[in-house]
């Protein structure tokens, strides 16, 4: 086991992690770009640039850094391997959560799809999966405690609206997907080399994704009231 403190928002930190991993183990066969934060609550026009940068740097740029630092080494090894990028159902459907988070997760889905095509067409034995769950019972709602000093402070979460949102999310914990269930889905996707990892059994999520795709094809405006719960 190699534990190394890493700021995934910084390319040099992720590159140092990759170097250390290859020096210790000689190869990396499964790469999970999983670090993520929820961000500050608030409308897109209310959030500061630091609020936007914080979420996009951690949720999207971290995946880009992981791909750039690890995938070339995985290609060079020539061994069968797999990349798992954590996105969200918010990377498939807009309007359910905050703007920065949605933008970042849509980016992770697009990057994963692009990587799938690039690696496959080049003939590299590297699979790609993108994980798109709904709400999972983790501490992502408390991610403000880990906000790097580079991004300053945000007082939006201290507003009554922000506190109400946090309380509502915490009240949902008993109905959320458990991390162990997600882990089983990820391992199965690696075994079957599946691109999309979306938990089954959530009719609301499936309906929302299907409705979005139909709206795009039919050039229809989406409805303003929907749920992914």
Name each model-derived stretch.
Residues 5-16, 49:
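The beta1-alpha1 cofactor-binding region of Rossmann-like NAD(H)/NADP(H)-dependent oxidoreductases
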Residues 20-33, 40:
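A glycine-rich helix->loop->beta "capping" turn
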Residues 42-44, 51-53:
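Substrate-binding pocket helix/loop in short-chain dehydrogenase/reductase
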Residues 44, 93-100:
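Active-site loop immediately N-terminal to the catalytic Tyr-X3-Lys motif
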Residues 67, 104:
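Active-site helix of classical SDR
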Residues 88:
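Residue(s) in the substrate-gating loop at a strand-loop-helix junction
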Residues 121-197:
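SDR active-site lid
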């Amino acid at each position: 086991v190699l534990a190394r403190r890493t700021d995934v928002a910084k390319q040099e930190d992720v590159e140092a992690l990759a170097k250390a991993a290859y020096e210790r183990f000689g190869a990396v066969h499964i790469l999970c770009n999983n670090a993520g934060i929820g961000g500050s609550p608030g409308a897109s026009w209310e959030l500061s640039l630091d609020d936007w940068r914080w979420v996009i740097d951690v949720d999207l740029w971290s995946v880009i850094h992981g791909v750039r630092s690890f995938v070339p080494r995985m290609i060079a090894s020539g061994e069968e391997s797999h990349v798992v990028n954590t996105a969200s159902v918010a990377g498939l459907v807009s309007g359910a959560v905050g703007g920065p988070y949605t933008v970042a997760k849509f980016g992770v889905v697009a990057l994963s799809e692009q990587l799938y095509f690039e690696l496959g067409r080049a003939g590299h034995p590297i699979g790609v999966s993108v994980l798109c769950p709904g709400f999972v019972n983790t501490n992502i709602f408390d991610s403000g405690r880990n906000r790097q000093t580079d991004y300053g402070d945000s007082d939006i979460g201290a507003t009554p609206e922000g506190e109400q949102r946090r309380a509502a999310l915490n009240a949902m914990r008993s109905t959320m997907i458990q991390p162990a269930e997600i882990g089983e889905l990820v391992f199965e996707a690696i075994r079957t080399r599946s691109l999309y990892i979306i938990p089954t059994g959530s009719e609301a999520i499936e309906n929302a994704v299907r409705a979005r795709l139909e709206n795009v094809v039919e050039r229809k405006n989406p409805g303003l009231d929907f749920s992914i719960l």
